[in-house]
């Protein structure tokens, strides 16, 4: 049985432009980095064999060098394979962070366990087959998973679980229901049609872009952000976790959220009986 951690939307370098207090912005940014250490702790605690990042590891395609070095050092400390696809914030177009010589040099030095998946083709691991569906531009009206419809599944090892790793919205959710990224909403772009995928050939669909915990189907999940990034908007708003996933070929995945968030965002309401109360 394969045991992995499904994460997404780390968004290292997020500016928190709506937070006026400079010290609070800095604290929020530091907690996003610290959450990577808590992902490592969960991986050790549950003897995970690999970590998935379903897009938006960075908040932009040109993050600050200090943030890049810090997160690479934290990823290197995980000491497990960390498989990453570009999302809409850190898409994989030429000239972006992933293609820079300095990033690639630092990655080799600090995080040799980071495996960037920018090609839409099967990746064969010892424990699984990963089917990456990276975003290669910020907004794309084509389905990043469309390449899977033409895949010859008979060429894949029959005994290994198959994992789709994708970033984007899912067909079937309206604009009010889709609570992805308020800074870069997906809208009609980057939409994934899960119904077009051959369900019997896929064991787990690891999604990113939705900032809340969300089960889309028996095999498809969004983990939400590992560190909360905004005020709660109701009981359905569950942030600050990763997903522990246990997989076997041909079986339904066993999925359990594991806490990684530290900060709590609270909405406070006051009722005044009269103007004199102020």
Located regions from the model:
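His/Asp/Glu-rich metal-coordinating catalytic cores
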Residues: 50, 61-221, 228-230
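N-terminal active-site segment of His-dependent metallophosphoesterases
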Residues: 1-70
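A structural signal for the main folded, soluble domain(s) of proteins
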Residues: 31-32, 37, 146-152, 252-257, ...
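Structural beta-strand/beta-sheet cores of well-ordered domains, especially the beta-sheet scaffolds
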Residues: 8, 162, 203, 218, ...
């Amino acid at each position: 049985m394969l045991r992995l951690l499904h994460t997404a939307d780390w968004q290292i370098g997020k500016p928190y432009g709506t937070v006026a207090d400079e010290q609070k912005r800095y604290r929020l940014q530091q907690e996003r980095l610290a959450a990577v250490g808590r992902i490592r702790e969960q991986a050790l605690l549950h003897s995970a064999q690999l970590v998935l990042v379903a897009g938006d590891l960075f908040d932009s395609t040109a993050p600050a060098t200090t943030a890049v070095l810090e997160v690479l050092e934290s990823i290197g400390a995980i000491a497990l394979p960390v498989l990453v696809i570009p999302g809409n914030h850190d898409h994989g177009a030429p000239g972006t962070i992933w293609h820079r010589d300095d990033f690639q040099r630092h990655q080799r030095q600090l995080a040799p366990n980071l495996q960037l998946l920018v090609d839409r083709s099967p990746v064969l691991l010892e424990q699984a087959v990963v089917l990456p569906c990276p975003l290669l531009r910020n907004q794309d009206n084509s389905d990043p998973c469309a390449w899977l419809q033409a895949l010859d599944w008979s060429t894949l090892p029959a005994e290994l679980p198959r994992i789709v790793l994708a970033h984007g919205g899912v067909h079937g959710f309206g604009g009010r229901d889709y609570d992805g990224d308020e800074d870069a909403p997906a809208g009609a772009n980057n939409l994934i049609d899960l119904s077009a995928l051959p369900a019997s050939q896929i064991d787990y669909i690891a999604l990113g872009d939705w900032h809340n915990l969300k089960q889309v189907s028996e095999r498809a999940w969004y983990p939400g952000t590992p560190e909360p990034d905004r005020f709660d908007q109701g009981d359905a708003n569950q942030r600050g976790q990763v997903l522990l996933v246990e997989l076997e070929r041909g079986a339904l995945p066993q999925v359990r959220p594991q806490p990684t968030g530290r900060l709590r965002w609270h909405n406070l309401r006051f009722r005044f009986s009269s103007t004199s109360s102020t």
